[in-house]
């Protein structure tokens, strides 16, 4: 969990670098908000096919945002957790995820999230800890714009709300309790 909340001007994508992850939407949204995002770093963390990573780098260059977008490769262990904690925002603009464990990891660290309706994370809205958007550049741009208008105090509260969501719905104790209830229903 973040120890303090100071805007670091750091946005994070952390997952496999693959076409289904919608990274192009994040790059295009960055281009749409190029002026507003000056001074920010958008870190793209993850491994993928070199040809696709190069395609994304070319897109960033073509849209003149290569100075904002940084491809940092795969990160694991303590380095991964540090990236989550230092990020002001985590973005997973994916086409489809069964769960999206990285969303849970970001929320557990107190980092607000933008993700799409291709994930089962509609609770981001009800817990006020992020944005659950339609899939695409326009929706990603809109959510990023709303993020940029948030104060540090608002973002800190969103981070706390996200941590609360994880503790209430996804802690090991809660999952175990839910499994016991499921077994009772099935077996009795």
Summary of predicted features, one role per range:
Residues 112-116:
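Short hydrophobic beta-strand element within catalytic cores of glycosyltransferases
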Residues 54-75:
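Nucleotide-activated donor-binding/catalytic signature segment of Leloir-type glycosyltransferases, i.e.
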Residues 9-32, 42, 51-55:
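A conserved mid-protein helix/loop that constitutes part of the nucleotide-sugar donor-binding site
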Residues 81, 99, 104-108, 121-123:
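Short alpha-helical segment that forms part of, or immediately flanks, the ligand-binding pocket
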Residues 74-75, 82-87:
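Short alpha-helical donor nucleotide-sugar binding micro-motif in glycosyltransferases
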Residues 154-169, 178-181:
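A short, well-ordered alpha-helix in the C-terminal region of glycosyltransferases
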Residues 95:
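Aromatic "clamp/platform" in nucleotide-sugar-dependent glycosyltransferases that forms part
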């Amino acid at each position: 969990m973040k120890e303090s909340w100071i805007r670091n001007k750091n946005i994070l994508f952390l997952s496999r670098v693959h076409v289904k992850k919608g990274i192009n939407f994040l790059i295009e949204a960055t281009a749409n908000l190029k002026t507003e995002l000056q001074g920010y770093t958008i870190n793209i963390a993850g491994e993928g096919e070199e040809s696709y990573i190069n395609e994304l780098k070319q897109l960033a260059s073509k849209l003149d945002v290569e100075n904002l977008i940084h491809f940092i490769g795969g990160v694991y262990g303590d380095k991964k957790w540090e990236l989550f904690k230092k990020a002001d925002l985590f973005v997973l603009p994916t086409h489809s995820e069964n769960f999206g464990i990285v969303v849970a990891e970001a929320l557990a660290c107190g980092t607000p999230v933008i993700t799409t309706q291709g994930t089962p994370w509609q609770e981001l809205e009800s817990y006020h800890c992020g944005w659950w958007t339609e899939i695409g550049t326009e929706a990603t741009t809109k959510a990023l714009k709303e993020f940029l208008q948030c104060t540090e105090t608002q973002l800190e509260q969103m981070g706390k709300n996200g941590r609360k969501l994880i503790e209430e719905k996804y802690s090991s104790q809660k999952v175990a309790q839910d499994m016991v209830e499921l077994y009772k229903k099935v077996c009795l």
